[in-house]
């Protein structure tokens, strides 16, 4: 609503609009702080040899965060794994995503870590049952006119593109 029209509204209505706006801002700020705290807690799970419970906790958190960020931007949100993240964490997460989407189909005694060249320099993500290089996926989506956002996970940092940039180091 334009400011010139806002000034002509009755005082009670203007106060209600301002109150509602401030309430939404406080909710958003509270959520961002909660996400920031959760990122800090889950950063500790980006270790060389996480337990299955730790990996499950990280997976649930990143999945929920991805859904939230995707809803905020009204687009698809993927997890972008940097090279420095331990393979057991990165591929364990992708393994779990695959099992949630497809069950054990196409995964007979095969670990996701065995599917990829370990010397790869590019960031990775998991999309529709496939481990993909982010640069290739970006090119494909750009050519199709599809916008995506990423939550970037590196060895000691989880970055989510929210209205207030959240970077945990």
From Swiss-Prot:
Extract the ranges annotated as region (Binding to host SKP1 protein).
Answer: 9-22
Give the residue interval(s) assigned to the motif LXCXE motif, interaction with host RBR: 110-114
**Keyword Phosphoprotein part of the UniProt annotation:** no
User: Where would you find the membrane-spanning parts of this chain?
Assistant: none
Record keywords, A-Z: Host-virus interaction
Its biological purpose: Interacts with and disrupts the function of host retinoblastoma-related proteins RBR, which are key regulators of the cell cycle. Induces transcriptional activation of E2F-regulated S-phase and G2/M-phase-specific genes. Inactivation of the ability of RBR to arrest the cell cycle leads to the stimulation of viral DNA replication.
Q: Which family does it belong to?
A: Belongs to the nanovirus Clink protein family.
**Quaternary structure (record):** Interacts with host SKP1. Interacts (via LXCXE domain) with host retinoblastoma-related protein 1 (RBR1). Interacts (via LXCXE domain) with retinoblastoma-related proteins (RBR).
Under which name does UniProt file this protein? Cell cycle link protein
Q: What is the lineage of its organism?
A: Viruses, Monodnaviria, Shotokuvirae, Cressdnaviricota, Arfiviricetes
């Amino acid at each position: 609503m334009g400011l010139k029209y806002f000034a002509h509204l009755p005082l009670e209505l203007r106060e209600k609009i301002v109150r509602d706006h401030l309430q939404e801002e406080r909710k958003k700020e509270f959520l961002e702080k909660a996400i920031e705290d959760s990122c800090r807690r889950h950063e500790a799970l980006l270790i060389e040899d996480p337990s299955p419970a730790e990996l499950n906790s990280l997976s649930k958190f990143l999945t929920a965060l991805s859904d939230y960020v995707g809803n905020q931007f009204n687009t698809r949100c993927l997890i972008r794994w940097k090279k420095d993240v331990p393979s057991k964490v990165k591929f364990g997460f992708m393994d779990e995503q695959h099992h949630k989407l497809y069950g054990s189909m196409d995964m007979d005694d095969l670990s996701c870590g065995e599917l990829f060249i370990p010397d790869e320099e590019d960031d990775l993500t998991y999309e529709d049952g496939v481990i993909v290089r982010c640069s290739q996926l970006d090119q494909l989506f750009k050519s199709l006119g599809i916008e995506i956002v990423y939550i970037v996970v590196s060895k000691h940092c989880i970055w989510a593109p929210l209205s207030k940039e959240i970077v945990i180091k």
